[in-house]
């Protein structure tokens, strides 16, 4: 197992228990050194994906075993990153998006997708419908909820619009991604139809397929 930064191996092997801490430290350093100009930070934590191993300082701190320990640390690390945005006076001018990529792992203690059927690798909603939290103080009202049909492919055109970026001017003749701008929906704008009125298609790991409309 190797841990890379750009094209350089920085740890071999690496300690899987400390990855969330390492990623957060790197992210905070990036924010601190990039604060003078607009920046984009993509932070794909590996936790709580398998293999689930708790940080030594977080071991046995939850009431839900090692999975709970890992999630509690993840919550803490995200809080550290949000605190950094506040300390650097970037909180009001930074869009934060947090989401999962799929439903829970089957056949594990924490494998619950209630009230939906299906889990990871399934085309049912328990495998494909995931939480997504968006924070942008002053533009997105805190505490609002939406059940609108949104896909991860909608993030690029939505965030580009929010940042005043015309994707067509940057595509150099190539087709713009199929995603849609759902910014009005995220802002809770009434009277504006939700942009995604078409369908989404998924295929499950067992060959099962589904269309969501």
Regions found by a protein language model. Name each.
Residues 41-51, 98-104, 178, 201-206:
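Short, solvent-exposed turn/loop segments enriched in Gly/Ser/Thr/Pro and often Arg
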């Amino acid at each position: 197992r190797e841990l890379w930064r750009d094209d350089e191996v920085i740890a071999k092997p690496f300690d899987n228990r400390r990855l969330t801490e390492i990623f957060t430290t790197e992210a905070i350093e990036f924010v601190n050194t990039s604060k003078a100009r607009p920046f984009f930070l993509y932070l794909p934590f590996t936790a709580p994906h398998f293999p689930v191993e708790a940080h030594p300082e977080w071991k046995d701190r939850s009431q839900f075993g090692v999975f709970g320990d890992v999630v509690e640390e993840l919550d803490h690390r995200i809080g550290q990153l949000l605190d950094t945005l506040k300390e650097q006076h970037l909180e009001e001018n930074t869009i934060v998006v947090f989401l999962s990529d799929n439903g829970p792992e089957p056949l594990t203690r924490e494998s619950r997708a209630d009230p939906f059927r299906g889990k990871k690798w399934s085309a049912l909603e328990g495998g494909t419908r995931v939480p997504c939290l968006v924070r942008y103080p002053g533009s997105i009202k805190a505490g609002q909820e939406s059940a609108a049909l949104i896909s991860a492919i909608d993030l690029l055109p939505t965030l580009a619009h929010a940042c005043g970026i015309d994707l067509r001017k940057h595509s150099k003749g190539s087709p713009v991604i199929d995603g849609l701008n759902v910014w009005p929906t995220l802002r809770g704008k009434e009277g504006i139809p939700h942009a995604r009125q078409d369908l989404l298609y998924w295929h499950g790991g067992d060959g099962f397929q589904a269309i969501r409309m």
